[in-house]
Amino acid sequence: MPQLAAVAKIDFPYRIDQQEVKQYAKKLFEPSFPQVEKMLCAFDNTEIKTRNFCKPLEYYSTVHGFQEQNAEYIRLALEYAIKAIEACIASAKIRKEEITDIIFISTTGLSTPSLDALIINKMRLNENINRIPVFGLGCAGGVSGFSKANILAKANPDAMVLLVAVELCSLTFLRNDFSKSNFIGSSLFADGVAACIICGDNLSCKAKNSIKFIASQSKLYYDTLDVMGWEFLDTGFKVLFSQDIPAIIGKNINADITNFLEKYQLKISDIKNFIFHPGGKKVLTAYEEALQVKGDFLKNTREVMNDNGNMSSSTVLYVLERVFQQDFEDGYGLVVAMGPGFSSEMALLQMHKH
């Protein structure tokens, strides 16, 4: 089975307290958003303590056009992706020349040539590397990319697959959008960059713990296209997400996980480690109520959200990094995220501490 060789995340220069962001958002929205005082509690309800941003707060007080915002996305995405990759390569104790495949995940900016090409060129990675850029999966992208990386390594036991997830959510902030969705988004989303390396069976994996991939599942829920996504405007990306998301999760997630695990003669009670994309407090509550697992089974997920906010696709890799570096129970692990489509992504793992 393919194995996780290393996972790494980065911190940005601007780690800002949620209360400071709250007061800054109040100042920005107050002149044109009558409900601002009533809605400020959204910042507290998230239970987020701090968030990472690629820019100082003052940057977001000025209107930036799409051309400027996207140019900054390309520049900073490349810079921070390379930092995460270099940390991951060092942790995996491999040479960059050994990487055979690269999967690049993002939904918060555009680039052609794609960012993976820019990374390969800047780092002088193998010029024959297999490239898979993926755009548009949003919060589900991290799990989808992780599954695809493992599937590549399963198909080619000599593969050393690099997965990179870069989300600069703050650069999509529209200064003159005084909608409820934009206000709620400003209370929740943050910037995150993470990378992991998956090695095939024929390669020697030097990881301190064993996390192996068993299988994955994707599901798209019919007639839910408008639940989450972007509206593309002349000014940039306008965030769209429905208040029905927790209800959709609550209605579907138990049956989806149960059906997935049954294929491998497993039940939810057999899972020892839950590596979930947090989404937000209401999403976590929906998971807890639907799955009815004893104990604080989403502890790592909750702590990542509290410390970082929702970093879209990269968030679940932050959770994976925390589990990988700290502690977990020997046994099965389950990685889950939901995203635009509306869709779910799942991966089943076998986990053992060395």
Model-based region annotation:
Residues 1-75, 175-251, 255, 338, ...:
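Condensing-enzyme catalytic core mediating Claisen C-C bond formation in acyl metabolism
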Residues 6-8, 105, 135, 160-167, ...:
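Short beta-strand segments
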Residues 16, 113-117, 144-147, 172-178, ...:
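Short acidic, glycine/serine/threonine-rich loops at helix termini
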Residues 46-125, 268-284:
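Conserved beta-ketoacyl condensing-enzyme motif
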Residues 84-99, 205-206, 255-272, 291, ...:
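Phosphate/pyrophosphate-binding loops at sites that engage ATP/ADP/AMP, CoA/4′-phosphopantetheine
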Residues 108, 126-128, 133-154, 250, ...:
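Claisen-condensing/thiolase-fold acyl-transfer catalytic domains that form or cleave C-C bonds
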Residues 111-125, 164-175, 225-230, 284-298:
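Acidic-glycine-rich active-site phosphate/pyrophosphate-binding loop
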Residues 156-162, 166-188:
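Flexible, glycine-rich active-site loops centered on histidine and acidic residues
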